[in-house]
Amino acid sequence: GRQGFGYEVTSLKGHIAEILGLDKKHHMIIVGAGNIGRAVANYPSFGREGFQTVAIFDADPNKIGTDVAGLKVLAIDTMESFLDENPVDISVLALPVKSAQQVLNRLVEKGIKGIWNFAPTDLNYPDSVTVVNVHLSDSLQILSFKMLRAED
């Protein structure tokens, strides 16, 4: 910035978006159409930020074919063929612990490079894949700790 003038906000926002990789469109799939998967699919700002959900998969026959955020839930058995035909770089894992590692392995085999993991488990994956774990209980524990410190 220039002294007395500050920064040109539009230019600064553009540079920050570029640094964060938000100047590109990211196509993502969600694996798991339960509460967390539906919440992620319906989150309004992801699309504006360049994260476009292109498919949702589930293994539950009662969820397959239902509508979530304007997308029809697809059978998890069709995931690989979908990935063969559609460019996807991020997958959201919103599924039970028991199937998380197996699904991650299938995604890695199909070239997915980014995993946003909501399954409450740590996964094994190659260095070529970036995984961000979202453990909801960790966030609550941090909140509790910060509240306790604020009381001191």
Language-model segments: residues:
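Hydrophobic, well-ordered beta-alpha structural blocks that scaffold small-molecule cofactor pockets
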Residues: 1-94, 99-110, 126-152
